[in-house]
Amino acid sequence: SSIIKPWVARLRPTYDPELMFQIRHISGRAGQYGFVSSHAANTFAVATFMSLVFKHRLTTICLLVWASVIGYSRIYLGVHFPLDVLCGAMLGVLVGAFVYMLQHFVHAKFAFSHQQSFSSAYTRSGFLRDDMYIVLTALALTLVYTLV
């Protein structure tokens, strides 16, 4: 998104001459340009990648809620227009899916084949459930912190 922002040169709401005095912003204005939202792109890339890796419904829901709350916070804080966040989210989904496919290709090409015993301690994709709970706990705490 750092490449896209100066190329598109769309002002953030806090820099838009028609809106800048109508928006109450909490902190500094950040950079001058806001299209696309880097926060939305990054969080949706992480959410997409982790959802594809873990293949666990509850984790996917939590990740999407987490990324959506971060995206909404950018609009609420007045640093992005809704379209900035939406396009950032779409970019993030594309990047997350691409990185997953790349990781899957590299893993299939260069990883040693090993047989993993599957039990109730593992998810369908082979991850320890305890690791999933750590991820879910971190997401929940981040979400609570964001909302408070």
Q: Which residues does each predicted region cover?
A:
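Transmembrane alpha-helix/helix-exit interface in multi-pass inner-membrane proteins
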Residues: S1-T14
